[in-house]
Amino acid sequence: MQLNDLRSAPGARREKLRPGRGIGSGLGKTGGRGHKGQTSRSGGKIAPGFEGGQQPLHRRLPKFGFTSLKALDRAEIRTSELAKVEGDVVTLQALKDANLVNQGVRRVKVMLSGDVGRAVTLKGIAVTKGARAAIEAAGGKIED
């Protein structure tokens, strides 16, 4: 006996239903589609979300929100993340090289969150009042 000689025992597997192929199948004549109406016809589907002429839910609810285009080229970083930048001078390009901000970012602001690990010099980067105090307390400076 080979693998290709193996067969299931008779009656072990149920035959596939073939709608519309005689009354003996249990799905003859209408083939399980019922009588008349849109869904009994071929191609008789209704669009997802269609509620029979009633105003659909997605049109009853109001629109809301928008995506600010300013958010696409601006970013915020924490004071604790400044330690991840190589060297003592932190510029926009240095932040991009350290993967702290995306490549498309054009403006960055440093927020006070965590401690500044070492003295760093910020060039061309905006800072909050608290972050400025923390950076200067650590011996760093901010240049515009």
From Swiss-Prot:
InterPro entries: Ribosomal_uL15 (IPR030878), Ribosomal_uL15/eL18 (IPR021131), Ribosomal_uL15/eL18_sf (IPR036227), Ribosomal_uL15_bac-type (IPR005749), Ribosomal_uL15_CS (IPR001196)
Entry GO terms, CC: cytosolic large ribosomal subunit
One Pfam family this sequence matches: Ribosomal_L27A
Keyword Transmembrane among record annotations: no
Coiled coil: none
UniProt source species: Azotobacter vinelandii (strain DJ / ATCC BAA-1303)
Disulfide bond residue pairs: none
Biological process terms in GO annotation: translation
Segments of skewed composition (Gly residues): 21-31
Protein name: Large ribosomal subunit protein uL15
NCBIfam families, A to Z: rplO_bact (TIGR01071)
Source domain of life: Bacteria
Annotated segments matching region Disordered: 1-58
Protein task: Binds to the 23S rRNA.
HAMAP family noted in UniProt: Ribosomal_uL15
